[in-house]
Amino acid sequence: MTQNSYKIPIQGMTCTGCEEHVTEALEQAGAKDVSADFRRGEAIFELSDDQIEKAKQNISAAGYQPGEEESQPSENSVDFNRDGDYDLLIIGSGGAAFSAAIKANENGAKVAMVERGTVGGTCVNIGCVPSKTMLRAGEINGLAQNNPFTGLQTSTGAADLAQLTEQKDGLVSQMRQEKYIDLIEEYGFDLIRGEASFIDDKTIQVNGQNITSKSFLIATGASPAVPEIPGMNEVDYLTSTSALELKEVPQRLAVIGSGYIAAELGQMFHNLGTEVTLMQRSERLFKTYDPEISEAIDESLTEQGLNLITGVTYQKVEQNGKSTSIYIEVNGQEQVIEADQVLVATGRKPNTETLNLESAGVKTGKKGEVLTNEYLQTSNNRIYAAGDVTLGPQFVYVAAYEGGIVANNALGLAKRKIDLRFVPGVTFTNPSIATVGLTEQQAKEKGYDVKTSVLPLDAVPRALVNHETTGVYKLVVNAQTQKLIGAHIVSENAGDVIYAATLAVQFGLTIEDLTDSFAPYLTMAEGLKLAALTFDKDVSKLSCCAG
């Protein structure tokens, strides 16, 4: 049997002794040239294909948790036997597309990218970058209007949304040029302008020209979805895209939706001076999160003055001149919400309508998403998909990760499976929400014996000195191993804290590991240690930094 090179992520290694145990376990399965690294949480070795499961069993028997194996490229460069005009043809030009193009180009492949609109995809053009800079502007304006400190007299005039939008557009243009457009020439792959449509599984047509490739990546992203509410198509509603192009601050804004886009943009406009009503069908915001998280952000947004309506049944929407009326029913009572603008933030739909995927034998799901396996292959094994078009976690860092996976798999550089178990997510409200790993409910559904700690934000010294104490830290732990399997935070700068929690979850740190570590005083990161201490102690009875 031929020996192949493998890499396996391994949880639970904490020292050089652990490396020795893992090495011994692998060698007992017949592995050669084993290199175990506890800092990286991985082992690389040579082994025949038929012994890989035995190797993983040995690792488990030694007390560690092996992940999915990845075959590693040989030391020889890949010899491309081109079957078409390109080795890899990418449809789309966002995070997944550029990651795949760069990886493929670095390994000698001939690559082309097809884009029908603006280069750069959602994140830099109409998503992360423009929304977060506008959120920051709103946050500063809101703090000037309502700061929590006595003795400070701060105020603000009317927000000039036209100037803010112009500044935002300048930033977007700069980042699009530097992080996307300039890289096309830097790496030397082809950019083809136009709409791509499959002719067959080897050919697409762009502007009437047929182009062939050995493999394809569909990375066309997603667009705002519009709910089926009577009258919605007859009113001038906003989406997350058009809301960021407004030149005047609306007096009244009604937001349909209960997710991160609804909360972020709703709070942004509130901070700029708009009267905001958030409406959602569910009984609570962020219904997929643990109740403590939903309750904390609900309390904070309500304290700030946003109007939240849950359990909504939408009856119809009507345009009345410059005003829009939303007819709803809540607990059997009919209401009418009047607004100058209506923002629809009810999710996103994949951009697959014009690709003619049937001609290439590519199957899609109920919402039009491209269906893929663990290698990101579609139902046609020469065609891959990555990023938002698959309706997986809709983060640019996930898309970029998946693009790299596709480049490896499509070009035969290494056979890699996707692993999305440890993807952190952040909602950039104030306070922000950050989460990684399993919720309490998810952990129970997976059969874990679960224990949790819930630390109110007023137990975190940084929150006290900020005079902003609405929030919570929640940790989810496997009671049998004491390992952290989930962390969920509502606090200022929660997104800056969650990376530490991500490493803790990914590499199997225990409660004791967290409580025995140093946490800088008067930082939000200290909340992680305090939440870990809460499993065994009442932290309100501890002096500063005592554990």
From Swiss-Prot:
Keywords: Disulfide bond, FAD, Flavoprotein, Mercuric resistance, Mercury, Metal-binding, NADP, Oxidoreductase, Plasmid, Redox-active center. Hg(2+) binds at residues 544-545. Its EC number is 1.16.1.1. InterPro entries: FAD/NAD-bd_sf, FAD/NAD-binding_dom, FAD/NAD-linked_Rdtase_dimer_sf, Heavy-metal-associated_CS, HMA_dom, HMA_dom_sf, Mercury_reductase_MerA, Pyr_nuc-diS_OxRdtase. Its cofactor is FAD. Binds 1 FAD per subunit. It catalyses: Hg + NADP(+) + H(+) = Hg(2+) + NADPH. SUPFAM superfamilies: FAD/NAD(P)-binding domain, FAD/NAD-linked reductases, dimerisation (C-terminal) domain, HMA, heavy metal-associated domain. Disulfide bonds join 123-128. Residues 4-67 form the HMA domain. PROSITE patterns: HMA_1 (PS01047), HMA_2 (PS50846), PYRIDINE_REDOX_1 (PS00076). GO terms for biological process: detoxification of mercury ion. GO terms for molecular function: flavin adenine dinucleotide binding; mercury (II) reductase (NADP+) activity; mercury ion binding; NAD(P)H dehydrogenase (quinone) activity; NADP binding; oxidoreductase activity, acting on a sulfur group of donors, NAD(P) as acceptor. FAD binds at residues 97, 117, 122, 132, 196, 388, 396. The keyword Metal-binding applies. Belongs to the class-I pyridine nucleotide-disulfide oxidoreductase family. The active site is a redox-active disulfide bond. Homodimer. Resistance to Hg(2+) in bacteria appears to be governed by a specialized system which includes mercuric reductase. MerA protein is responsible for volatilizing mercury as Hg(0). NCBIfam families: MerA (TIGR02053). This is Mercuric reductase. It comes from Staphylococcus aureus.
